Amino acid sequence: MPDDFNLKSFLADLPHLPGVYRHLDAAGEAMYVGKARDLKKRVSSYFQKNLASPRIAQMVAKVASVDVTVTRSEAEALLLENNLIKSLRPRYNILFRDDKSYPYLLITGHAWPRIAYYRGATSKRGQYFGPYPNSWAVRETIQILQKVFRLRTCEDTVFANRSRPCLLHQIGRCSAPCVGVIEAEDYAHDVQRAVRFLNGEAREVMDEIEARMLQASTELRFEEAAVLRDQMGSLSKVLHQQTMENVGGDDTDVIAVASAGGKICVNLAMVRGGRHLGDKPFFPTHAEGEQPAQVLEAFVAQHYADGAMPPVLVCSHALPDSGLVGLLAEQGGTRVARVLTRPQGVRRSWLEQAQKNAEMALARALTESGARAGRTLALAEALDLDTDEESLDALRIECFDISHTAGEATQASCVVFLHHDMQPSLYRRYNIVGITPGDDYAAMRQVLTRRFGKVTDGEAPMPGLVLIDGGKGQVEVARQVFVELGLDIQSLVGVAKGEGRKVGLETLVFADGRPPVALGKESAALMLIAQVRDEAHRFAITGMRARRAKTRNVSRLEEIEGIGARRRQRLLARFGGLSGVSSASIEDLASVEGISQELAVRIYDALHG
């Protein structure tokens, strides 16, 4: 520790209050962030002789100073701790990928509610069900609701402009409220039954439909009875196919931890409305040598800090901090009925299945991780890079590609490979402007100057390897940019396509004068290079197409005489995009504010001519 940091005096002055502490290294970087009910007791515990965790002991040996922040409550400390962990990403904290974009099923607050797949903040008017572990689980549930309750899924703009029932009505998946085939009261009843189904009352809904069917039949309303019969048949089929369990109606998260080969998997299974919706595995970083219970606690703290916690948690291990769940529930304004580590009945089978799935996911990850690390090693050996384990894990590869269509909507892409895997959150797109259309060399010069100018300014990291999708010409442009910026050209490598553009025949072109190298189609190093190059190409093309489509959509409407920015916006908002405008009738177009019958005819002719 530095001479100006008196540990003994510092510990003596710490208060017996809740708060957050940060262990800092000699450079002032946060190595570890934690919360405490009692700062004095918690921080002092790190400086005892016998620490249980070798990893934490290693961290304490590097501590140069400690920062503390006193909070008004332990709940406030928990919130601050989570925010600091997310922003600082300390290297000795167990870290989980910040994934808050879980999908929900939304039943809108429309007069004729629609069911929809939804991601994002749950702030729109309507009822939200979830979260679901993946998009597949949401879409499967929507299909069930379509089959059984025939609720609409169309956008409001489409709903407002239908003149006849759509195909979904013809195949029995929608009751066509858009054209008045079903009464508002009957549709509202279907929505209510769908909500009850999602809340786990499937059996009760089934009994209610059966009673209504028998009543309709008794009263000789045979068409209504037939509809209810079909509805009951569809629901019966769903109940037979799905695992619908009566466990008191409480939504449940099942969390199991598995460890092997120095790696840990936390598997989260979600049960909503009595339906097991599937699993989602998480693989934390900085968890080497940690006990499963500690990893589980870190997951619970980070996962539920900003998200809703269900009433029941079923866990494979007891949480070391027994008060954590209560703090999270208090912070989120939710009621957690209980945390179970030795569940009975169906919850026990859920936990056993979650544990098996955690072990299977971990086995797959270990196999894939070994293969990925092997490819990184092969590439490092082929290019004479450092091959120790730490250097390989830290090897950052960036690949640049240019994409356009005959010079239109030129975009450059930069994709990043790090920690033996692609890192989509680090990808970037660059709109290329001020060049001659189709001049790929000028486009490459512009993107490299913009990206690596930030390196020279100290605002961005320098990758260990820079791949250029192109041959000698593109590499020469890149070399010139690096020389101008004072950067090492040894990290520049071009990937030149082989004869017939066949995969496996690529040649590596070096900016520093080394002779070109053909690794061969069986090379693990070339497989990795091809993966990164192809990902850059894919990312560039999707961005270019989106930009081109946006430009064309706007320009096609603006080219029509009488259509300015305001009318264009009204048309696009009313019909949900250019395709909706194109499919609208003249009468539909004329119903938009500011669009006369004459202008509607002109728009229709321009889009269909």
From Swiss-Prot:
A GO-annotated cellular component: cytoplasm
PROSITE patterns hit by this protein: GIY_YIG, UVR, UVRC
Localization: Cytoplasm
MF GO annotations: DNA binding; excinuclease ABC activity
Domain UVR: 203-238
GIY-YIG domain ranges (all copies): 16-94
Chief location category: cytoplasm
Keyword Oxidoreductase among UniProt keywords: no
Matches recorded under Pfam families: GIY-YIG (PF01541), HHH_5 (PF14520), UVR (PF02151), UvrC_RNaseH (PF22920), UvrC_RNaseH_dom (PF08459)
SUPFAM superfamilies recorded: C-terminal UvrC-binding domain of UvrB, GIY-YIG endonuclease, RuvA domain 2-like
Keywords carried by this UniProt record: Cytoplasm, DNA damage, DNA excision, DNA repair, Excision nuclease, SOS response
Gene Ontology biological process terms, A to Z: nucleotide-excision repair; SOS response
This protein's record includes keyword Ribosomal protein: no
The organism's place on the tree of life at top rank: Bacteria
Function: The UvrABC repair system catalyzes the recognition and processing of DNA lesions. UvrC both incises the 5' and 3' sides of the lesion. The N-terminal half is responsible for the 3' incision and the C-terminal half is responsible for the 5' incision.
Assembly description: Interacts with UvrB in an incision complex.
Similarity comment: Belongs to the UvrC family.
NCBIfam families: PRK00558.1-5, uvrC
PANTHER family attached to this UniProt entry: UVRABC SYSTEM PROTEIN C, UVRC/OXIDOREDUCTASE
Protein name: UvrABC system protein C
Provenance organism: Bordetella pertussis (strain Tohama I / ATCC BAA-589 / NCTC 13251)
Taxonomy of the source species: Bacteria, Pseudomonadati, Pseudomonadota, Betaproteobacteria, Burkholderiales
Designated gene of the protein: uvrC
